[in-house]
Amino acid sequence: MNSKIIFLFLFSIAFSLQIGAQNNHISTPPEVSPMPMKAEMTEIWEPEVSVVTPAKTLGDAPSDAIILFDGTNLDQWVKQKDNAQPAPWKIVDNDHMEVVPGSGGISTKMKFGDCQIHIEFSAPDVVEGSSQGRGNSGLFLQNRYELQILDSYNNRTYRNGQAASIYKDHAPLVNAMRGPLEWNTYDVIYTAPRFKKDGRLDAKARITVLHNGVLVQNNVEISGNTYYIGLHDYPSAHGDDVLSLQDHGKKTQFRNIWVRPL
């Protein structure tokens, strides 16, 4: 009998201690570390965060952006297949540029890696054609990875080839295309691929895209170089490279293009 009483007594003490320990743990505020620290020990002051002045109008370039096209000239662009030649597209009303069908694509003079891009585009003034034949163009990141530009307003095509798709790789989450004669925007956050010293792929490129302010690509991996026929891949290592706009035989229009290297 005495041994049972002693056992029950010891058990009750152990149980009480366990409950007390749990209560003490629960009562510790989650925002206070149990380590003996002061608040300033986790404050980082240097280097001070750089100041960038945002644009007064949404979509305009912030103070640290590189202006690639402001409507007045094509000085930052060259012919895609011969960078010794000037960009062959035309400027309209000192406001926007227009593809000259058959003249070939254009590329930036500067090369980029990780970057933020803003670009505005409009389908041709005359709505004609269907599927891939309506207002087709493309923004090529590092001259390899295509963000599709297409008039996808009431225009059915394959889902991974419509506006805001990573062409034949990722369909957009939604179709956010505006109607005829309206301007569209792409805001892009691009992370370039990484390669090992021996040239092998270490990390694929990634991209986030907002189409007219709507999220359509959410930090997706780019499978590789864009091909019309065949599977995307990374055939060779590369560094920074140009941005290119495609001539697909349609009078697609562009304005207000800027980039922020990241």
Where are these predicted regions, by residue range?
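Carbohydrate-interacting regions of secretory-pathway proteins
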Residues: 22-262
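Bacterial N-terminal signal peptides
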Residues: 8-16
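Sec/Tat signal peptide C-region and signal peptidase I cleavage site
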Residues: 17-21
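Bacterial N-terminal signal peptides that target proteins for export
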Residues: 1-7
